Amino acid sequence: MLTDHTIKFNKLLTPFSFLYGIGVRFRNQLFDWKVLRTERYDLPIICVGNLTVGGTGKTPHTEYIIRLIKDRYRVAVLSRGYKRKTSGFLLADQRSTSKDIGDEPYQMKRKFPDILVAVDADRRRGIRNLLALPENKRPDVIVLDDAFQHRYVAPTLNILLTDCHRLYTQDRLLPAGRLREPMDGARRADVIIVTKCESCIQPIDFRIIEEDIHLSAYQELYFSRILYGELEPVFSGKAPRRTLKGLASTTEVLLVSGIASPAPLEKEIHKYTEHVTSLIFPDHHAFDRHDIQKIQTAFKRLTSTSKLIIITEKDAARLRDLPSLPMEWFSHLYCLPITVGFCMDREKQFQELIVKHIDTRIKNHPILR
């Protein structure tokens, strides 16, 4: 069963969660009462977000949608650009770094160089700037990354993600739990995806969770799981091709991660070698020379003649920008890409939902083309 585990809360912080909840509920009511104005747009706007802080898989799901539609439409991704060193609206180009636009937008621009990637904390301003582009560059569809709480923009399709190991229905408001807003905010979602499922999901899990989240008639429920790709050299051409399946049982791996939920990645690598040393940093950690020294010290402690460093794609974005990395890393440093797949043979149904939504919106507003 998917949710057979215990979620820990800080009970001492419960009074603060109560006060936080009052503020968030009042803000949501202001939007519901139309005191705060929500902007609507003619073109398709797909929001991918969640109710919680921490990793639910927004980036791989956003990339899944990009991969699905990029050859059919002109696609733009608009993100806040979390922890970037710039401000205001910025349209990414091939010279942009993770410091300029943030880890996730940088990763998406590297993977999909032909799409538009923009960052702006003010999503309305960001959309206005994208729609002000020349007609041959103007997007047909905008994907909003992590904007479920940004209610100043009304998406035409709202996709809500929830980790199967920590459903929002079982969580509590910040700071005692991880909820950004009360769970009834899920009513704004058109699609709910239960993420990070095990490959052995059973139909009974679908029914239990469907009842647990009280799915509304207008909502669709999907389950997805993480799919790991092949190891990729962080510095192209500097390291030999390697695969997880090809690792010898004696291979030693130093796993370096600065993401919200590193446990699934650790579990995956342990399938191929027992010799895994983990260095865990906070989510979106800005690596500095002291961290590099710490990683180098840990790497030198590995005694096998077959050893490598594995990092996530997001961490690779930050490490690439650092000067003076140890030379020996260039032939030992790999990142492990991830994608998502849908469970219970519903992948085609999800794809059709996305494409039909976009086609319908564009057909109803042909001027967009």
Curated annotation (Swiss-Prot):
It catalyses: a lipid A disaccharide + ATP = a lipid IVA + ADP + H(+). The keyword Metal-binding does not apply. GO terms for cellular component: plasma membrane. It comes from the Bacteria. Its EC number is 2.7.1.130. GO terms for molecular function: ATP binding; tetraacyldisaccharide 4'-kinase activity. It is an enzyme of class 2 (transferase). Keywords: ATP-binding, Kinase, Lipid A biosynthesis, Lipid biosynthesis, Lipid metabolism, Nucleotide-binding, Transferase. ATP binds at residues 52-59. The keyword ATP-binding applies. Pathway: Glycolipid biosynthesis; lipid IV(A) biosynthesis; lipid IV(A) from (3R)-3-hydroxytetradecanoyl-[acyl-carrier-protein] and UDP-N-acetyl-alpha-D-glucosamine: step 6/6. GO terms for biological process: lipid A biosynthetic process; lipopolysaccharide core region biosynthetic process. Signal peptide: none annotated. Transfers the gamma-phosphate of ATP to the 4'-position of a tetraacyldisaccharide 1-phosphate intermediate (termed DS-1-P) to form tetraacyldisaccharide 1,4'-bis-phosphate (lipid IVA). Belongs to the LpxK family. This is Tetraacyldisaccharide 4'-kinase. It comes from Parabacteroides distasonis (strain ATCC 8503 / DSM 20701 / CIP 104284 / JCM 5825 / NCTC 11152). The lineage of its organism: Bacteria, Pseudomonadati, Bacteroidota, Bacteroidia, Bacteroidales.
